[in-house]
């Protein structure tokens, strides 16, 4: 294993909050492989780069010689995590959860080492609790404690319903840590309440409490909201290399440094050198190309990364249109602003109107100036800015 100081520096890279750091240092000094857990409810089949921030950190622990478990919440996925929700999340069927879980496993192994990764399902212990076990688990907390959660508090104050089973979710996630005797649990900053519940339940069960490590939420392509499919600002890990390359090149120069910190495995000293070069006049585009190629090589191959770079150069330095682009179908009567939003070319309808006004939207290579246009039936190519293309069919 690496020295404690070197290991701690690697572990803390990009971390938003570590609770508590001194306990992590004490665990590292035990000079044994720590039990590291990352849990995920397979509520959707596809993973985007925002999800990989925490997976990258799990890989760091793996590379440092620790025992890593990727826990699939097949039981909790059927309950539904209420985190950040102002309404009760619709429960998934077991068939949905298991189907999504298979896709999850295929995608996470693009980051994690399959030979060093333990996959577990929390139904292994949660389905055995039974009514008595559930009541005993619920007795560890109070309604007042649950209402300390921001999302529960807001719903309660606004008179919005909170289902009893939603109160159980943090307890079930916390019990995962008891069942696994976890040393360190990873999660996003939005999971803080649930992660700390694991510490509390471990103490109640006579275990040493886990260390909680939280990673920040990755900002999406728009530079404002967290990366998500609903915001149309994401990069899927299974997207075509050319599509990934173009999207990464579209981020702002400032956001690029955050992506380097959270998505790259390059040494921090090398990233600092890149920053110095840009400060001294180097073109940030060249540094961004290195980032794009690193990410694409990880999820596809180095050959794909090289080809995507060449296509990017051909497309934007020689004015060529990409051979591959996302394709969409819409019913006739859709407004141009809605079309651009639904095709993922802009973040919102107001953004669409602004881009049209600025002359940044093209229809089949011609500048589009009518912000009230109702596109005619047929297939056309829409372009926003230099890098975003979509082939749209109006039926």
From Swiss-Prot:
<feature type="short sequence motif" description="'HIGH' region">
    <location>
        <begin position="42"/>
        <end position="51"/>
    </location>
</feature>
<dbReference type="GO" id="GO:0003723">
    <property type="term" value="F:RNA binding"/>
</dbReference>
<dbReference type="InterPro" id="IPR002305">
    <property type="entry name" value="aa-tRNA-synth_Ic"/>
</dbReference>
<dbReference type="GO" id="GO:0005829">
    <property type="term" value="C:cytosol"/>
</dbReference>
<feature type="domain" description="S4 RNA-binding">
    <location>
        <begin position="334"/>
        <end position="394"/>
    </location>
</feature>
<dbReference type="InterPro" id="IPR002942">
    <property type="entry name" value="S4_RNA-bd"/>
</dbReference>
<dbReference type="Pfam" id="PF00579">
    <property type="entry name" value="tRNA-synt_1b"/>
</dbReference>
<keyword id="KW-0547">Nucleotide-binding</keyword>
<dbReference type="InterPro" id="IPR024108">
    <property type="entry name" value="Tyr-tRNA-ligase_bac_2"/>
</dbReference>
<dbReference type="GO" id="GO:0004831">
    <property type="term" value="F:tyrosine-tRNA ligase activity"/>
</dbReference>
<dbReference type="InterPro" id="IPR036986">
    <property type="entry name" value="S4_RNA-bd_sf"/>
</dbReference>
<dbReference type="GO" id="GO:0043039">
    <property type="term" value="P:tRNA aminoacylation"/>
</dbReference>
<dbReference type="InterPro" id="IPR002307">
    <property type="entry name" value="Tyr-tRNA-ligase"/>
</dbReference>
<keyword id="KW-0963">Cytoplasm</keyword>
<comment type="subunit">
    <text>Homodimer.</text>
</comment>
<protein>
    <recommendedName>
        <fullName>Tyrosine--tRNA ligase 2</fullName>
        <ecNumber>6.1.1.1</ecNumber>
    </recommendedName>
</protein>
<dbReference type="InterPro" id="IPR024088">
    <property type="entry name" value="Tyr-tRNA-ligase_bac-type"/>
</dbReference>
<keyword id="KW-0067">ATP-binding</keyword>
<dbReference type="InterPro" id="IPR001412">
    <property type="entry name" value="aa-tRNA-synth_I_CS"/>
</dbReference>
<keyword id="KW-0436">Ligase</keyword>
<comment type="similarity">
    <text>Belongs to the class-I aminoacyl-tRNA synthetase family. TyrS type 2 subfamily.</text>
</comment>
<comment type="function">
    <text>Catalyzes the attachment of tyrosine to tRNA(Tyr) in a two-step reaction: tyrosine is first activated by ATP to form Tyr-AMP and then transferred to the acceptor end of tRNA(Tyr).</text>
</comment>
<feature type="binding site">
    <location>
        <position position="229"/>
    </location>
    <ligand>
        <name>ATP</name>
    </ligand>
</feature>
<dbReference type="GO" id="GO:0005524">
    <property type="term" value="F:ATP binding"/>
</dbReference>
<dbReference type="InterPro" id="IPR014729">
    <property type="entry name" value="Rossmann-like_a/b/a_fold"/>
</dbReference>
<keyword id="KW-0030">Aminoacyl-tRNA synthetase</keyword>
<keyword id="KW-0648">Protein biosynthesis</keyword>
<dbReference type="Pfam" id="PF01479">
    <property type="entry name" value="S4"/>
</dbReference>
<dbReference type="GO" id="GO:0006437">
    <property type="term" value="P:tyrosyl-tRNA aminoacylation"/>
</dbReference>
<keyword id="KW-0694">RNA-binding</keyword>
<feature type="short sequence motif" description="'KMSKS' region">
    <location>
        <begin position="226"/>
        <end position="230"/>
    </location>
</feature>
């Amino acid at each position: 294993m690496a020295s404690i100081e070197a290991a701690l520096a690697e572990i803390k890279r990009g971390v938003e909050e570590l609770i508590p750091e001194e306990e992590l240092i004490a665990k590292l000094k035990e000079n044994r492989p720590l039990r590291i857990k990352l849990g995920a409810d397979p509520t959707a089949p596809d993973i985007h780069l925002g999800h990989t921030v925490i997976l990258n950190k799990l890989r760091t622990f793996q590379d440092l010689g620790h025992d890593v478990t990727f826990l699939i919440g097949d039981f909790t996925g059927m309950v539904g995590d209420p985190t950040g929700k102002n309404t009760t999340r619709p429960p998934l069927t077991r068939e949905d959860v298991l189907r999504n879980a298979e896709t999850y496993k295929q995608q996470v192994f693009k980051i994690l080492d399959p030979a060093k990764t333990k996959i577990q399902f929390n139904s292994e212990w949660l389905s055995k609790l039974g009514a008595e076990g559930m009541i005993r688990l619920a007795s560890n907390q109070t309604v007042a404690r649950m209402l300390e959660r921001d999302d529960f508090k807001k719903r309660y104050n606004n008179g919005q319903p909170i289902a009893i089973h939603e109160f159980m979710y943090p307890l079930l996630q916390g019990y995962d840590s008891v069942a696994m005797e976890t040393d360190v649990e990873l999660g996003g900053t939005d999971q803080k309440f649930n992660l700390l519940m694991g510490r509390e339940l471990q103490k109640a069960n006579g275990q040493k409490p886990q260390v909680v490590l939280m990673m920040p939420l990755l900002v999406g392509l728009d530079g404002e909201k967290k990366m998500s499919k609903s915001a149309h600002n994401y990069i899927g890990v299974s997207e075509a290399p050319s599509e990934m390359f173009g999207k990464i090149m579209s981020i702002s120069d400032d956001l690029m440094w955050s992506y380097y910190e959270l998505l790259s495995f390059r040494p921090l000293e090398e990233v600092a050198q890149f920053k110095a070069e840009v400060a001294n006049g180097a073109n940030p585009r060249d540094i961004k190309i290195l980032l794009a190629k690193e990410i694409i090589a990880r999820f596809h191959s180095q050959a794909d990364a090289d080809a995507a770079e060449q296509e990017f150069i051909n497309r934007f330095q020689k004015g060529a249109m990409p051979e591959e682009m996302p394709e969409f179908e819409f019913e006739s009567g859709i407004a141009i602003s809605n079309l651009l939003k639904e095709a993922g070319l802009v973040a919102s309808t107001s953004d669409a109107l602004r881009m049209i006004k600025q002359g940044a939207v093209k229809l089949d290579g011609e500048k589009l100036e009518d912000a009230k246009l109702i596109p005619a039936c047929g297939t056309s190519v829409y372009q926003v800015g230099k890098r975003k293309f979509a082939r749209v069919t109006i039926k």
